[in-house]
């Protein structure tokens, strides 16, 4: 598996292999958004498990309430985040990035703010919030910054063809891209060319009237032309096809078809979303750009990851749920112990509890565990009933 474990260098950042821990919200922060020991422990395990680059979960750039999400809207959050980056950097050769996110207002009663509702003053504040968060990220010791412009997040809603604003922030592709470009430009000016800046976008919104792969390749080419350092590809996760929440539960953008495709399930084919990174990578290469592309979406085992790289469908392999399930996935693969990998079964228990703002855990861990056990070997199998019931069975 030569390519998977080859070093990879771009924009002055050297990775010891091509495996990236992509953002999965843990809900291990305090209710006010501060780093906890359990959260640090989760990322320490992933770092020690061999991933070259950890991009931590969506860190919110505004003070708007959202329980147990990490925050960075004020300097008071820097010390905790510094503790996290120092812990990861203690593991030789591991880089740590931060994903910055912004969301619009939504209520339990069904109200959902849209980008069309925002004033120009509010848009300028969103740009400023992202800039200040980026400055704090550098102070906290992160090696890279990623803007969350996928799924249901604010920047994704601006990029979508469903953005019907009548001013310079809506309508045409250039206008829909404007807020992302302005955030990138002011941040690049503030942090310099040496700091790694990337964007995570949808390859396909998977809803009527949203962006398709055709539109996303054009977005990717514009971002590559602007010299972003990397692109990370996701899909779906839109409000437009989300189901109404059950009584007493918070609304979620991941309950409709687009949400199910954002987190491919057990019945989806392995590598279900890789065609999106493949299409985008081919398009940006054809346009003359060499920007690295991260793929993700149901890549359970090393052999598929290696195949994706060898076939040129991505430059880096993003793992979310597999590293949540087994943080030692990379080390076991590197040492030829693939049979010891505790394989993610894609039951999406983690996604379901995440939607309820509960601690994101794995059904294969011992009961009541906050993080994966260590050492961790596959001692049981897990059966999945189609009704959504999960049951451990000893072998």
Identify the role of each PLM range.
Residues 1-395:
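Flavin-dependent oxidoreductase catalytic cores
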């Amino acid at each position: 598996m030569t390519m998977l474990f080859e070093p990879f260098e771009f924009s002055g950042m050297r990775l010891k292999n091509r495996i990236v821990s992509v953002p999965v919200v843990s809900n291990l922060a305090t209710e006010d958004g501060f780093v906890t020991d359990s959260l640090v422990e989760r990322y320490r395990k992933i770092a020690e498990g061999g991933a070259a680059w950890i991009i931590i979960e969506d860190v919110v750039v505004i003070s708007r309430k959202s329980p147990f999400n990490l925050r960075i809207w004020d300097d008071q959050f820097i010390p905790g985040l510094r503790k996290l980056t120092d812990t990861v950097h203690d593991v030789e050769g591991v880089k740590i990035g931060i994903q910055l996110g912004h969301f619009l207002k939504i209520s339990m009663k069904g109200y959902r703010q849209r980008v069309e509702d925002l004033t120009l003053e509010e848009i300028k504040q969103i740009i400023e919030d992202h800039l200040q968060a980026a400055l704090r990220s550098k102070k906290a010791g992160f090696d890279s910054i990623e803007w969350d412009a996928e799924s249901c997040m604010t920047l994704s809603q601006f990029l979508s063809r469903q953005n019907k604003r009548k001013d310079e922030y809506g309508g045409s592709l250039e206008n829909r891209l404007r807020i992302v470009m302005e955030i990138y430009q002011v941040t690049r000016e503030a942090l310099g060319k040496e700091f790694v800046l990337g964007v995570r976008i949808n390859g396909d919104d998977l809803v009527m009237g949203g962006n398709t792969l055709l539109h996303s390749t054009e977005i990717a080419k514009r971002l590559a032309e602007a010299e972003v350092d990397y692109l990370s590809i996701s899909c779906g996760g839109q409000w437009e096809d989300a189901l109404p929440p059950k009584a007493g539960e918070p609304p979620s953008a991941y309950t409709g078809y687009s949400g199910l495709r954002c987190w491919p399930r057990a019945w989806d084919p392995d590598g279900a979303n890789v065609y999106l990174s493949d299409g985008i990578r081919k398009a940006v290469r054809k346009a003359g750009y060499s920007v690295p592309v991260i793929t993700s979406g149901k890549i359970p085992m090393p052999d598929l990851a290696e195949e994706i790289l060898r076939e040129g469908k991505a430059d880096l392999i993003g793992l979310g749920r597999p590293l949540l399930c087994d943080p030692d996935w990379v080390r076991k693969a590197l040492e030829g112990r693939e049979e010891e990998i505790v394989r993610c079964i894609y039951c999406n228990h983690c996604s379901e509890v995440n939607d309820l703002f509960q601690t994101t855990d794995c059904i294969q861990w011992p009961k009541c565990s906050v993080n994966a056990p260590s050492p961790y070997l596959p001692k049981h199998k897990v059966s999945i009933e189609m009704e959504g019931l999960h049951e451990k069975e000893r072998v």
